[in-house]
Amino acid sequence: KFTNCVTFKNTADFFLNFNYLNFNNETILVKGARHFQFEEIVTALEEKTHETVLEINLNAISHNLNFYKSKLKATTKMMVMVKAFGYGSGGFEIAKLLEHHKVDYLGVAFADEGISLKNAGIILPIMVLNPETTSFSAIIQHHLEPEIYSLKGLNAFLEIAEKRKLKHFPIHIKLDTGMHRLGFEEEDLDELIATLKGNQFIAVKSILSHMATSDDLEQQDFAHAQLHLFEKLSAILMTELQIKPIRHILNTSGISNFPEAQYDMVRLGIGLYGVSNDPEEQKFLENVG
C-alpha cells in the first residue's frame, strides 16, 4: 500500500498535470518500459530544476516611473527603454503598464523586440536603437522607427523607402557627441544634410545623442562639452533642414544630474527598475523584483 501517491493513466496524462507537481529536494526514480517514453519525463524534470521565476512588482515599477516623472518639466516627453525585453522583467507586461501611464515612446535594442511588442498589441511608438540593415523591411512592415547613426545605414534605409514609395516614414538621427560608439560626427553633417534635404520618403522624428559620463559627477566638464556639442550640431540640422524634431540626450542618471538639458524628451532606462548610481536617490526608489 502506497501513501501520498498520485497516479496517471499514461505518460500523456502525466504531462497534463506536470505544471501542478512540486518537487523539492527529492530523489526521483524513473523506471518503465521503453514504449512509455519515460525519457520525455526525464527531460521535463531536468528542465524544471533549472527554471527560475522572477516576480515583478508592477506597483514598484509605477512608483519609480512617477519618481522620475516628477523631475521633469510639464512639457518634457518620456521615452522608456524596454530593451532586452525589459531588462529581463517581461517586455510586454512592462510595455502595457507604460502605455497605461501614458509615456510617449518605447525604446528597444533590436527590431525583433519591437516586433514582439507590436504583435502583442502595443500601440505606443517604438524606436529601435540598433537596427541592422537586414531588419529594415521588417521595421517598416511593423511600423517601428529606426535609429539611424551612419550614412551607410541611412542610404540603405532610403533605398528600401524609395522602393516602397513611403511618405515621411519616421526615423531618428543619432549624433556622436563623445560616446564614440555610434552616431554622426560633425564632419558628417554636410553629407547628412544633403541626403536628407527635400527627401519625401522619410521624416526626422527626433535627433538624439548619448551621454558617456552622466553618472559621474567628477566628469562634469566632459558632460557639459557633450551637451554643448549636441546643442550645436542639432541646431545646424534643424536650421538647414527647416525642421523641429524632438531632441533628447538624457538617460536615467542624466535626468537627475543635468535637469537643464531635458530638451523635448528624456530616456528612462534602468532607473525604472529601481537602480540608481546615486545613494541618496536610491532611497526613493523601490525594488521591483
Regions found by a protein language model. Give the residues of each.
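Active-site loop/helix belt of alpha/beta enzymes
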Residues: 53, 60-64, 70-71, 84-97, ...
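Short hydrophobic/aromatic-enriched beta-strand-loop microsegments
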Residues: 2-9, 49-51, 123-132, 145-149, ...
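N-terminal active-site wall of soluble small-molecule enzyme domains
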Residues: 70, 74-144, 148-157
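Short, polar loop motifs at secondary-structure junctions
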Residues: 1, 34-35, 111-113, 131-134, ...
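C-terminal helical cap(s) of enzyme catalytic domains, especially alpha/beta-barrels
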Residues: 38-54, 115-121, 278-289
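Glycine-rich tight-turn/loop motif centered on a GG-T
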Residues: 46-57, 96, 141-146, 219
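Hydrophobic residues within beta-strands of alpha/beta enzymes
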Residues: 28, 106-107, 126, 247, ...
